[in-house]
């Protein structure tokens, strides 16, 4: 009972005590957990909204970590006691928003100010250390074994005060810097050590730093270094992400960079230590090695030692960070290194000047004052500028080496890491406008570079102009940033439209505010733009003179703004014609194309009238190219022929004008220096003219001119320096090679071009790029027929049946020009080895606007040809038959290949039978009939042939001038020699230099000399006949004038006078087929073209007793040599696009 009473008393006491404490707890709960009304009435007091008691101190609450303040009360929590902070539990405490960020900014500013103070007084510390013995020993030890640290930034010697020792000042003036960019051998995306211990990162830091020391430094003090694996690459550092978080939360690689930049940077071994300079009268130059990813022993070059009289360089390894690598453009940099390429500061500045003056005006998306400043802004942009400027070098050695290195550097910079700089997008755009070397279309990285630049620019906010702060705070700063960011974004728009048009792909860029604003504003003054690009001193003045209103930053150079307006029209054109949802190929329905294209064409003409495109040749060429694309849309399959007819003449006139404008540009520029949008315009013109000469829709008066323009483009493309032509493969060589293959198709299988109706008949899903792919298909199809006679026979039968049941009257009906199957397709004089070292292109523009090109051998080519002729033929007089395999009589050809011209220049009627050569050095050297050289008659003696020999070796430039890549008719006449290497044995004195086409004087055209294969060469041709043949080569007919004959086996009755209008005979196309020793089973193969059927056996047995080849066989060998790869069975040469792995069976 007592126990129970005691328990009951305790219960009463507990209940009474509980009752007393209950009001206090209720008050506390009401204070901490207010009612709904109280929360509504006091919603502004944020401290009243706590849903649970506060048990953590203010510091732990801010960092959201566990706190034991309630258990240790009244003592501070463990963390505050360890760090020494004031521990307080305050439920009403709330930090102000942005206060921590402001504190961080203040800390950064304070660190920068202290750092500037230390740098300004570096000589004082050196002087003090030299006063004590320990300081001298420390300096000597550190000087012998420097510790390279990432994040190294070389201070500007010009910014240091003059106070201090004279030795230190002299060292600053004399020190030189070699900056080097390293490429990793293989990407290292994952780090081996992922621990968070700071000591581990310190050890890894020391290991990776020592790994890049010179071998001599490693041998002197290797015991104190941390052991590392010899072949382990250093961890990959992000060169653009700013360590704005705590180092504990950073990835391992960035923690290492953070540790290096914040701990080692303020030590005597740090990057700002004056020890990195020289402390003795014998100055040692400093090497700054800027690395993206360092391979082991990557810095084995430029071995440096202390106090070396040769002033070698001591390495200081650095990695790119958000802080500029070279704060001042006046730093004493004397060398830039990438891989095995080393560029001195003088050469870098020269290449920089070449780029700014010769390349940047074509695509003004950036500005730069000197090479050092450009390198400090972006290494990728710097090396891209150097690469592009190397296009002007006479030798492509450096260009070829840099191209592969820069391709790898671009991949590492953009794919492995995430760049935070507009300069990266600018570098990618430059690589798009002046593409890297490539053999096939699919090998070209330009379109992928455009897409990458566009994606990066979206991330950087380039499409939103002034709202850069809403995208990232870690971008590389640049002067007048919004202006150049806007130009870069507009450059992406233009490059994407240009490459989409080249590849025949739909563009993805759309018109936005920045584009509309730039197009609506006026042109920027050229003087201001030049100041941006060239003069650094005038840059500040230009900024002060900028217009105060906002629109000044949207103003563009006149040419760039006009190019953007054309690109904007291209986007509209592609969207209207090639973005249909009602057809599987995406094209507008054929019945609506003509009307739509007519409206768009008028809009383009109005745009040209408003913006005056003709004021600039570069803009005018691109305008004409856009106009050609409008015509090309009309040539796509299923477009009615009646709707195509108006665009055929317009396409011809536009394409020939592009050829003429390109010829004018090449008077002052090299072809390889021109941007891709100009070269693409010329390429597209050549391809469309090649197609137009195959269609009956082209008027006869334009036929010769179209073919001559194709020859001109090919010769301008091939007539490059030998070193560039043999070492660099790009769009220039690819286009020239493609034209040569198409020419070979004209020889071997011309029916491939005319089996289908229409100008573009087999491709349709590549927009205007279908023209290129259609011609590529023809090359592959002809080669397949060449290798498979059975397939060729089936294809011909199938085409004949299809033609029989076709209802297209324009292509099948008889007219003044005959049906398309009755038309004779003649090969073009396209030569693939006419480099500038051996030939010079003499161009002339006729009054009708056609540019005609004539090849003239150089002095060196004639000398080599004579030496080769003596070696092969054993002639003592040094007779010359050909130069680089090209018969001299064919050098003057500008239209179709003509057989008689191979022998018309010989004075002996038995030259052919006696196997005489085509050109004899003992004879007079005259000019081609279509040359622009003045004519001077040289008296010849029939008794003494040696009396008229022209010593074109000793006379030098007076006979064979030192020409550039081309010569136009604008050159003064007195600069030309009186006699130049030509094609005929006697000078032509009665031929006018003004050779016009049949366009201006419509006359009945004669047959091509290709038709008149004369088998009786005993008749001697006079000079007048030779001249008539040359003049008629520009006005030959594509169709016979006399009635056709179903049997053309009696070719020995051909009239010997090739200028006669009675010549009605045609050579069979099998004349160009393989000889019997190559493919004997084709000797009696029949070729069917229209109603004419001939056999090749009639022309394979005309060799004489001396086994002399007929003209047909000579041309066969010549074109086989020109088209290497067809006869040998190597199909890789035909793969312009990259279709070698695709199905090329009949169903393709």
Curated annotation (Swiss-Prot):
Basic and acidic residues compositional bias, start-end: 538-550
Q: List the disulfide bonds.
A: none
Start and end residues of each stretch annotated as Disordered = 1-51, 148-180, 524-550, 1029-1063
GO molecular function terms attached to this record = DNA-binding transcription factor activity, RNA polymerase II-specific; transcription cis-regulatory region binding; zinc ion binding
| Any one GO BP annotation for this protein | DNA-templated transcription
Q: Which residues carry this modification: Phosphoserine?
A: 8, 263, 806
**What compartments host this protein?**
Nucleus
Give residue spans, biased composition: Polar residues.
Answer: 1029-1050
UniProt DNA-binding residue ranges: 57-87
Would you tell me the Gene Ontology cellular component terms? nucleus
- Low complexity bias spans: 150-169
Keyword list (alphabetical) reads: DNA-binding, Metal-binding, Nucleus, Phosphoprotein, Sporulation, Transcription, Transcription regulation, Zinc
What is the protein's known function?
Answer: Putative transcription factor that seems to be involved in the sporulation process. Suppresses the lethal phenotype of RPM2 deletion.
Q: What is this protein called?
A: Putative transcription factor SEF1
